[in-house]
Amino acid sequence: MRRYLVAAAVGAAMAMAGSATAAEVEVKMLNKGAEGVMVFEPALIKLAPGDSVKFVSTDKGHNAETIKGMLPDGGTTFVGKMGEDVAVKFDQAGIYGIKCAPHYGMGMVAMVVVGTPANEEQAKAVPQVGKAKQVFATLFERLAANKTAAK
């Protein structure tokens, strides 16, 4: 009987060691943050496939939504409601561009990088408006620096 209990305990431990739970990252939508005004904080989010992001409407008057064309093939689009939190699960590897619709031109954008992205050049080619162009250039530079540092 004791051997069976030990075997069952070892089997259960091995099953638990092989499983992983998905993570949820919280991103604040702010009128003013460490990087300036009208920002997502953090603006560069790295995830594993299956992880989620909860966009939190810390300051009212913001939303989070995908930018047309700036997501991988098979990636899910979403549009969060104004002034409300929205949680999004990212299953498809790739780069996702996120914007706050009313403050997009002011540079209120974020980049979600899931797994190993295959759509980086496609994402870079999407035209951006106003200050969003500069913010995305900075985010792509940070992404490249992180890749170089990881080698």
What is the role of each PLM region?
Residues 7-15:
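Bacterial N-terminal signal peptides
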Residues 1-4:
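Positively charged n-region of N-terminal signal peptides that target proteins for export
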Residues 6-7, 146:
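General helical structural elements
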